[in-house]
Amino acid sequence: MSHESRLQQSLRQLLLSQRTAALAVQPLADFINVSALPAPQISMVPWAWDAEFFTLIIHVSGLASHTQAMEQHPAVSLLMTATEQTGQGVHALERVSIQGVASTPPEGSVLWQGARKAYLARFPEAEPMTALGDFRFVCITPQSGRHVAGFGAARDVDAQDLIAALNPAA
């Protein structure tokens, strides 16, 4: 039986307590005007964890610019933060940024079915949205991250740390 560090326990508690994340994507490239640097795109997304395929699941509209950007540039980042507490400073607010690779499983595939099951287990109220033609599941495979447990308590985490934190039964 292995001992889980306090930082790993803290990461697990943070991830399991948050249902939304800020999703950052590379903007669509403007190959005509290469001198103009497009700003990164950020959106708030509900997310779920697929423990079978070790992916974070989001459900997004294909009409959204961030979805189109993910299709062109699958490298993404997610940021989850602890909830602010009245009277406490925000500089030591616990947070984790996760870098990953986004992919859209074909509708009806085993990955799609797993994504749908995991997402609806966490967000059953989203079931009607799964029938909308422009919405799709996106699987984000975690690659690495940065966990800030508090002021002066920051560390890099690898994919295995993230997977272990997201799998409470592991």
Regions found by a protein language model. Give the residues of each.
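An N-terminal domain-cap segment
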Residues: 1-71
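General beta-strand recognition
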Residues: 55-57, 77, 146
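C-terminal edge-of-domain segments
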Residues: 4, 117-118, 122-170
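Conserved hydrophobic/aromatic beta-strand scaffold that supports enzyme active sites
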Residues: 22, 42-46, 97-99, 137-139, ...
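Short, structured beta-strand-loop surface elements
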Residues: 63-122, 142
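Short glycine-enriched loop/turn motifs at secondary-structure junctions
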Residues: 51-53, 96, 131
